């Protein structure tokens, strides 16, 4: 799924259902109050030496306040502990299944590297694009959907216009859904400048901006001239393909009529900007290096990432085209194309630069959409998957692995096991959660996640803690999408910084000069003028307060104090550091602050 950064039509989405948010927070708050009360009781028992009653409370009669505590111990052991132990065992089973899935994927990736397996086009490398008749240069439509992306539109348009492909054989569509008149004017002027420099590029703006990104792409595909093109490459507004992108992706389609999609991996211009971007980089490196590559090699199927990919237009049409029914139109079209028998290729060695969200607020909203959308899609696609005439193992892979295990079970057990059940077992010690579940296997899984980005090894502990912290957002999103709560169907702006715009345009200038024989790269003067102009109305950055994260921080720190009384070392340290992680996130002390 792509980190889509636009907002189409309607009001700005808060990213989650207000009803679900309030109920979820009320549940966490009640749990915190209960845990504090239990901690007070346990502290009193510890001070008075009643902790020895735990072994004899079921047999020996006691009197006074001590008898009340003994009654609580009997009730806890008889009624509470079995229920919590059942929940614990169920979550541990899910945890082991998911860990086994992750391990198998890592072994598949290791096998790919060991055997040096990679997709190779059946045709040889393409010669210089100046001679389009010398080789395979099919007609390619290049689309840049965007919406109010003032910070990044110049670099994406410049990068796409400098693609090394015969000018007569590709057309750029700038699909601008901006509702800001100033942004519309800037983008329209940028397109005009490239047109004047010889680029085949058109500007499209919709009056009725329905359907979000899917509606934008669907509208663009309805143009009469699209019938003249065989393939369509899609780049979100913050993506900057290298000049040889089409030369390294399109040849895979030649003599391979079953191939519907070629997907490239992402690289990030701001991965070292702050701790938040470093942790995101770990996650996404694993996603591309392991998940996408393994599924592409062994299954010829994976979720389309929404950008930096080339589709065969026939495959899009055969699969029903772009649909606006969910907020994950990229995954939607990929699943439908897979059900129609189309194959996918993932190119791990072809990279396309983009940006990572630098603030926690932007990242949280992005993750909410990424985890609510698949649940919407699962509800809609399940009947089609069951009725589809594909082989059984492909149906099983889609239902049990692609959707249930990786999109539903993972966020469910992560939140439930480490944020709910683990604290509960501290106050109900008769229900046990083994050390290897709390520490050893999560550490191993984090180590596997970090292998595709070995330079990130020093961040392994922050990564583990932050992933557990994000589980509250992912769990909330999953429930929202599964039960169609609130604004699960709304888009959320992902703020972009446009950090590399001027440098990238300058680096593209020689390429543009070489092909078009012009005097200067478009809009460099405008950039310089904008930078020299005095800035007005500079907005102050501030920290947001996230109540759910702060409440969970208090819960985990309370449980840590209780585990200290029980002398449970590993549990204490895990709860302590996890509680601190929730505290830092709740105070918005990770990543850039928002304006």
From Swiss-Prot:
Keyword Transferase included in the entry's annotation: yes
GO cellular component, one term: Golgi membrane
Protein name: Probable xyloglucan glycosyltransferase 9
GO MF, any single term: glycosyltransferase activity
Keyword Disulfide bond assigned: no
Free-text function comment from the UniProt entry: Probable beta-1,4-glucan synthase rather involved in the synthesis of the xyloglucan backbone than cellulose. Seems to work simultaneously with xyloglucan 6-xylosyltransferase. Xyloglucan is a noncellulosic polysaccharides of plant cell wall and consists of a glucan backbone substituted by xylose, galactose and fucose.
Family named by the database record: Belongs to the glycosyltransferase 2 family. Plant cellulose synthase-like C subfamily.
Annotated substrate binding sites: 236, 238
Keywords: Cell wall biogenesis/degradation, Glycosyltransferase, Golgi apparatus, Membrane, Transferase, Transmembrane, Transmembrane helix
Major subcellular site: Golgi
Places the protein is found: Golgi apparatus membrane
InterPro entries: Glyco_trans_2-like (IPR001173), Nucleotide-diphossugar_trans (IPR029044)
Entry's transmembrane regions: 30-50, 77-97, 408-428, 433-453, 545-564, 570-590
Enzyme class: transferase
Membrane topology category: Multi-pass membrane protein
Residues at the active site: 177, 330
Gene responsible for this protein: CSLC9
GO BP of this protein: cell wall organization
Entry's EC annotation: 2.4.1.-
Domain of life of the native organism: Eukaryota
């Amino acid at each position: 799924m792509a980190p889509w950064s636009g907002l189409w039509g309607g009001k700005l989405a808060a990213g989650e259902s207000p009803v679900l948010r309030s109920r979820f927070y009320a549940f966490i708050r009640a749990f915190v109050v209960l845990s504090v009360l239990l901690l007070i009781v346990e502290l009193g028992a510890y001070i008075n030496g009643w902790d020895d009653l735990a072994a004899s409370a079921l047999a020996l009669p006691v009197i006074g306040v001590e008898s009340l505590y003994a009654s609580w111990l009997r009730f806890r052991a008889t009624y509470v502990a079995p229920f919590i132990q059942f929940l614990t065992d169920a979550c541990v089973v899910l945890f082991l299944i998911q860990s086994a899935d992750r391990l198998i994927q890592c072994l598949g990736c290791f096998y790919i590297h060991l055997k040096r397996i990679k997709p190779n086009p059946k045709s040889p490398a393409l010669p210089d694009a100046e001679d389009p008749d010398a080789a395979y240069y099919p007609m390619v439509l290049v689309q840049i959907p965007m919406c109010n992306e003032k910070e990044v539109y110049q670099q994406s348009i410049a990068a796409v216009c400098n693609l090394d492909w015969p000018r007569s054989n590709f057309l750029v569509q700038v699909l601008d859904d901006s509702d800001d008149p100033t942004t519309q004017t800037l983008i329209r002027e940028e397109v005009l400048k490239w047109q004047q420099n010889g680029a085949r590029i058109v500007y499209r703006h919709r009056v009725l901006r329905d359907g979000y990104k899917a509606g934008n792409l669907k509208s663009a595909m309805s143009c009469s001239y699209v019938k003249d093109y065989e393939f369509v490459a899609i780049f979100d507004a913050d993506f900057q393909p290298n000049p040889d992108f089409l030369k390294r992706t399109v040849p895979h389609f030649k003599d391979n009529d079953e191939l519907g999609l070629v997907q490239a991996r992402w690289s990030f211009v701001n991965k070292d900007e702050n701790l938040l971007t470093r942790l995101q980089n770990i996650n996404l490196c694993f996603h591309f290096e392991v998940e996408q590559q393994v599924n592409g090699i062994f299954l010829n199927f994976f979720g389309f990432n929404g950008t930096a990919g080339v589709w065969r237009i026939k495959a899009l049409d055969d699969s029903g085209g772009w649909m606006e029914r969910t907020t994950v139109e990229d995954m939607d079209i990929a699943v439908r194309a897979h059900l129609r028998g189309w194959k996918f290729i993932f190119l791990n060695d072809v990279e396309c630069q983009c940006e990572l969200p630098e603030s926690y607020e932007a990242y949280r909203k992005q993750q909410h959409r990424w985890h609510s959308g698949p649940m919407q899609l699962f509800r809609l696609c399940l009947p089609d998957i069951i009725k589809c005439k594909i082989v059984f193992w492909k149906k099983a892979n889609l239902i049990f692995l692609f959707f249930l295990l990786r999109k539903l079970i993972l966020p469910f057990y992560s939140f439930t096991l480490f944020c709910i059940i683990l604290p509960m077992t501290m106050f109900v010690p008769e229900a046990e959660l083994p050390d290897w579940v709390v520490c050893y296997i999560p550490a191993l899984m984090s180590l596997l996640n970090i292998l595709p980005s070995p330079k990130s090894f020093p961040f392994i502990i922050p990564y583990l803690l932050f992933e557990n912290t994000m589980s509250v957002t992912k769990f909330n999103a999953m429930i929202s999408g599964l039960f169609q709560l609130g604004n699960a169907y709304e888009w959320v702006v992902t703020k972009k910084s446009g950090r590399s715009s001027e440098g990238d345009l300058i680096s593209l200038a020689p390429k543009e000069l070489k092909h078009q024989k012009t005097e200067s790269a478009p809009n460099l003067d405008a950039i310089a003028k904008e930078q020299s102009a005095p800035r007005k109305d500079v907005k102050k950055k501030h920290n947001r307060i996230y109540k759910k994260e702060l409440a969970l921080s208090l819960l985990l720190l309370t449980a840590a104090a209780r585990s200290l009384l029980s002398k449970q070392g590993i549990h204490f340290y895990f709860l302590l550091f996890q509680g601190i992680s929730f505290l830092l996130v709740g105070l918005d002390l990770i990543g850039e602050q928002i304006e």
